[in-house]
């Protein structure tokens, strides 16, 4: 970790620390359910995988819903690429959804929130949170049943010790704000 992380002038300030874990949450405008159908959720997941790879962000966990998403990723050496990466993701998915709905220029995304995860406990708690978000929203009974997130892969492929650490991680007061109500599919 650098002694003086790069900052983006924002309130609260955004920290850009190379090779650090970040959690990002984004919401659609007015929490509208633009991604309610399965094909739209697939579109959102595929775009997230594509865009994070293009910017050198290593995805650790993700979950996409009808009106929001969460992801955790490790930043590249230039962590300040977060903003243009999110702008590209939002632009690409908004254009695609607008094309599907036969409209142009409609705003789809409202904004995003990012958190720099600087402790192992925070990282494990957020992994747990992202993977279990579909359960929280009562879309599935077990996280690995939700096809639009990484929980199934994590359950099948992650080292058992890591799975146990994540499972045991307790949410804390800095848990992400999430008052979304995804549409039932």
Predicted features and spans:
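Short catalytic/metal-binding and nucleic-acid-binding patches
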Residues: 1-185
């Amino acid at each position: 970790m650098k002694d003086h992380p790069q900052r983006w002038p924002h309130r609260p300030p955004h920290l850009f620390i190379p090779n650090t874990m970040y959690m990002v949450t984004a919401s659609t405008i007015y929490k509208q359910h633009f991604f309610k159908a399965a094909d739209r959720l697939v579109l959102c997941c595929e775009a997230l995988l594509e865009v994070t790879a293009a910017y050198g962000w290593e995805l650790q966990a993700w979950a996409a819903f009808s009106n929001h998403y969460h992801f955790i990723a490790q930043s590249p050496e230039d962590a300040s690429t977060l903003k243009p990466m999110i702008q590209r993701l939002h632009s690409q998915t908004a254009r695609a959804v607008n094309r599907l709905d036969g409209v142009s220029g409609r705003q789809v995304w409202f904004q995003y929130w990012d958190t720099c995860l600087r402790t192992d406990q925070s990282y494990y708690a957020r992994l747990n949170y992202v993977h279990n978000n579909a359960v929280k929203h009562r879309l599935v009974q077990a996280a690995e049943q939700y096809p639009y997130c990484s929980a199934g892969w994590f359950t099948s492929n992650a080292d058992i010790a890591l799975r146990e650490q994540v499972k045991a991680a307790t949410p804390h007061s800095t848990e992400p704000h999430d008052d979304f109500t995804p549409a039932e599919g």
